[in-house]
């Protein structure tokens, strides 16, 4: 199999959606990588320099407004309202929200360690696992979120939940979870999304569309942090992205125009209100 063969094959996929083309290409490349590992072929033709890897058609993120976040939060049943705080205030993914424990929170230093998620294995079997990308990270704990967690725990004490680790039948692992179901189990997205999240959206008048899933809270966190001047590198670390470049590509349109920042910076030096320097006869200032 030659790189030119891959190039020709990719041309036959030109009419498919960019994201789907990328998924198909990635799957084929994975097969070739396995063949290389098994010494069946010398090289992966998909990784040749002449082969242009398909790119996803990234849609521009339109972050929720503060008013929408608060409205959806208030429409969630009281038992599940903390979901909004964890998503919009900490930038957690849904599985990480479901797996957060008070043991992960340092209330003294104001820091949260994101070290597990609840994920589904083989359809509906719940397991604990590392966060996406197998990447444990630390996230700052804002005072408002800390207050919400503290108040929530006085009404809903954390509960110990045991799940297999990473795979069905994996080593049983117990964590004290902040959020649990009425049956005292870990929250399951197959129940939470259709029966808790979407009804809240409906009551607020938010369209039940993919971009309005729980991930919208995470986008709100990122857009708010960037708007307030946080760096892409820091936001990338808080979100658990493996590549800051991905964070930049996803959220760059939400960042303040660099030209405006530059103009303000120069105006602060040479503008009407800037102090004038005194030039001496020898040319010094």
Positions of predicted regions on the chain:
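Basic, Lys/Arg- and aromatic-enriched nucleic-acid-binding interface segment
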Residues: 18-26, 35-100, 108, 119-120, ...
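N-terminal core-binding DNA-recognition domain of tyrosine site-specific recombinases/integrases
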Residues: 1-40, 58, 185-193, 206-216
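Short, basic (Lys/Arg/His-rich) helix/loop patches that form interaction surfaces
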Residues: 18, 71-81, 90, 139, ...
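Generic recognition of well-ordered alpha-helical segments
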Residues: 8, 26, 30, 143, ...
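C-terminal secondary-structure termini that scaffold catalytic or DNA-interacting sites
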Residues: 74, 109, 120-145, 150-151, ...
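Short, polar N-cap/turn motifs at the start of nucleic acid-interacting alpha helices
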Residues: 104-111, 230-252, 260
């Amino acid at each position: 199999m030659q790189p030119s063969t891959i190039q020709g094959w990719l041309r036959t996929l030109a009419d498919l959606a960019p994201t789907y083309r990328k998924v198909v290409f990635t799957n084929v490349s994975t097969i070739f990588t396995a063949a290389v590992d098994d010494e069946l072929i010398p090289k992966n033709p998909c990784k040749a320099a002449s082969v242009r890897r398909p790119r996803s058609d990234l849609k521009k993120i339109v972050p929720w407004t503060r008013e929408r976040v608060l409205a959806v939060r208030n429409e969630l049943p009281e038992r599940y309202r903390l979901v909004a705080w964890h998503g919009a205030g900490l930038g957690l993914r849904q599985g990480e929200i479901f797996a957060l424990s008070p043991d992960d929170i340092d209330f003294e230093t104001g820091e949260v360690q994101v070290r597990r998620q609840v994920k589904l294995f083989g359809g509906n079997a719940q397991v604990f696992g590392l966060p996406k990308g197998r990447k444990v990270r630390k996230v700052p704990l804002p005072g408002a979120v800390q207050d919400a967690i503290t108040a929530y725990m006085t009404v809903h004490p954390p509960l110990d939940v045991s799940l297999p680790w990473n795979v069905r039948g994996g080593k049983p692992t117990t964590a004290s979870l902040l959020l649990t179901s009425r049956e005292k189990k870990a929250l399951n997205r197959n129940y939470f999304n259709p029966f808790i999240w979407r009804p809240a959206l409906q009551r607020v008048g938010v369209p039940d569309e993919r971009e309005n899933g729980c991930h919208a809270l995470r986008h709100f966190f990122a857009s708010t942090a960037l708007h307030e001047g946080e760096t892409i590198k820091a936001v990338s670390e808080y979100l658990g992205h493996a590549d800051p470049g991905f964070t930049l590509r996803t959220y760059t349109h939400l960042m303040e125009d660099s030209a405006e920042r530059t103009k303000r910076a120069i105006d602060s030096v040479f503008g009407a209100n800037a102090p004038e320097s005194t030039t001496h006869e020898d040319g010094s200032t």
